[in-house]
């Protein structure tokens, strides 16, 4: 077996007085006939300092050396390489990082510390010979995910393996063995011992599992594994609560949870997190009223709680929450053109992602991949607006804020500009400087009248405080 290995790393293997092995994904993917990974894991019965010195001699610079775990990080030809000494790991029980390690010169012991047999096949970089202490080659041939030791033991050591199982099985198209599923299910609660940041990172990788080896709908398969192993109950209990909640059969073929999964299945990669969470408010709405009405409003708050708990980036959180709040707009397709025009301008910053979500939501109802009728209607309206030259952003407006001086009070400038944008949304031909200046004067006058009719509530209180 010959792997795609950087030249200087291969030379290092030939010069070393110990066998140097590739292990993990690089070997697994080569045996499975999958595209080569850029990252390479290597190992040997040698300590980190000895390997680091040899690497430096070969012209490969080590970026980090961790003597306690026998780990050396390198980069060569733009590829990341991680070396580890043969070792066995000891865990407190469920946490991702081992609490102690013991170095060994036995490849069998090193293989047993790994998670799945498909990741415990070794290739000697000098001879090209494959070493398979645990029968991982057969599992790769049969596209099976099996643990290196009893599944209960493997998952009880490191809770992150619960999510790695779902993600890697989905990426590879492998089927977890029954023992593996049962072991994961028995230890599902151990995911609570893993940091929110790691869970979120693994969830994102799973939601993009189809991209690793171009396996269509792989991410959907990963979500189903999270459901079957009940890991979903711990990382996203609000979503899992949708299991078994029936929906109107004239609109839906699936319960709330399965619909969320299928919406995510058909969603563009850029909005999959929003697709997964878009109906997360339905269980709460049903609990309150016995109906799903208002689940979009409830869902916005619940999605925010989830993403803050997972420590998702603020930008991602805001996008997902906005899309969740807006996804029900014009569901029945009865919104008037004037309303759609205003909506498209008000929500221009999330309009394209919202279209993607509405399409995925439509497809997820009855697995219908045709164009969502509401989107066809919206597209006709926005195409018309573009032909008219309607501005969708303040930058496209024919007047700037400084041009409203003397017409509009300075504190009201931002409000007036937004109103001008909506004014033009109804007829793009209005986007002319003179027309907008006249309209700005009218708007300013209306604001003054409103303020005169409804004085600020805080004014009497301020006067009392002055006395």
Give the ranges of each region predicted by the language model.
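Catalytic cores of the polymerase beta-like nucleotidyltransferase superfamily
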Residues: 1-467
């Amino acid at each position: 077996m010959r792997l795609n290995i950087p030249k200087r790393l291969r030379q290092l293997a030939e010069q070393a007085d110990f066998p140097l092995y590739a292990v993990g994904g690089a070997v697994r993917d080569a045996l499975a006939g999958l595209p080569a990974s850029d990252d390479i894991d290597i190992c040997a019965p040698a300590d980190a300092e000895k390997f680091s010195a040899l690497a430096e001699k070969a012209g490969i610079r080590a970026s980090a050396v961790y003597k306690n775990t026998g780990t050396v990080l390198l980069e060569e030809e733009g590829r990341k390489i991680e070396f580890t000494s043969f070792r066995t790991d000891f865990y407190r029980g469920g946490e991702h990082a081992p609490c102690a390690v013991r170095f060994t010169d036995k490849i069998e012991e090193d293989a047993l510390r790994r998670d799945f047999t498909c990741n415990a096949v070794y290739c000697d970089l000098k001879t090209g010979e494959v070493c398979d202490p645990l029968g991982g080659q057969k599992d790769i041939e049969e596209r099976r995910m099996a643990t290196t030791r009893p599944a209960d033991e493997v998952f009880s050591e490191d809770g992150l393996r619960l999510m790695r199982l779902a993600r890697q099985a989905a990426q590879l198209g492998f089927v977890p063995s029954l023992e593996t599923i049962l072991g994961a299910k028995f230890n599902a609660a151990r995911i609570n011992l893993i940091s929110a940041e790691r869970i979120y990172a693994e969830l994102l990788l799973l939601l993009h599992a189809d991209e690793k080896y171009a396996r269509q709908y792989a991410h959907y398969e990963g979500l189903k594994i999270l459901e079957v192993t009940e890991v979903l109950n711990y990382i996203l209990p609000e979503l899992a609560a949708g299991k078994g909640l029936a929906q109107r059969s004239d609109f839906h073929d699936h319960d709330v949870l399965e619909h969320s999964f299928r919406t995510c299945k058909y969603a563009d990669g850029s909005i999959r997190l929003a697709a997964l969470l878009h109906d997360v408010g339905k269980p709460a709405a049903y609990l309150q009223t016995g109906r799903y009405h208002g689940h979009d409003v409830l869902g916005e708050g619940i999605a925010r709680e989830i993403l803050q708990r997972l420590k998702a980036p603020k930008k991602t959180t805001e996008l997902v929450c906005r899309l969740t709040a807006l996804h029900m707009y014009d569901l029945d397709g009865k919104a008037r053109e004037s309303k759609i025009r205003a909506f498209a301008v008000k929500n221009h910053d999330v309009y394209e992602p919202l279209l993607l979500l509405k399409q995925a939501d439509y497809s997820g109802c009855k697995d219908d991949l045709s164009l969502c009728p509401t989107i066809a209607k919206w597209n006709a309206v926005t195409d018309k607006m573009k032909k008219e030259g309607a501005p969708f952003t303040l930058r496209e407006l024919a007047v700037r804020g400084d041009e409203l001086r003397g017409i509009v009070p300075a504190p009201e400038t931002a409000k007036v500009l937004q109103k001008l944008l909506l004014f033009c949304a109804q007829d793009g031909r209005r986007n002319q400087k003179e027309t907008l200046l006249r309209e700005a004067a009218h708007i300013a006058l209306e604001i003054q009248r409103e303020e005169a009719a409804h004085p600020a509530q805080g004014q009497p209180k301020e006067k009392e405080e002055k006395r």
